[in-house]
Amino acid sequence: MNYEIVEINEKIVIGISKETTNKDGQAVNDIGELWKKFMGKGIYNAIKGKKNDKTIGLYTDYQGDFTSPYSFVACCKVNSNSDKEKNLEELNTNNTVGESIISKVIPAGKYAKFVIVGGQKEVGDFWFEFWQMDFDRTYISDFEEYQCNTFDTKKQEVHIYIGIK
């Protein structure tokens, strides 16, 4: 698999979260359900001050390595702390979307960036192949950034960033 090493700036994201694990395929089910809620309940559309049209799947709060529990956040990037605060107040106080909305910060730093084309199956295949590779990971934040380049999910471009030391 080809990749490049990149330095990224901090990103403020807003979305919904679920703790999961890769054990027994649990994450596949949990992540799929979280995306359905994020898009299907109108959470994505309700978030104001989005930086762009891209969606992000964030892996964070690792309790060890990829075999241990972690949190997955279906989210999008917002422009500023002010946008973050407004969204948290409006969406949680008014219970606008029926889900608890959270904010996370994807830290600035060094990441291995992979680019794949495809849908959920191809993203899953990427992770199974990636876990066989030897990377000195930070286990702080990894994320998938969906480029929204097409309505055909089988041709979607996805940038996957793995936090590395």
Features from the language model and the residues they span:
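A solvent-exposed interaction/effector surface
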Residues: M1-K165
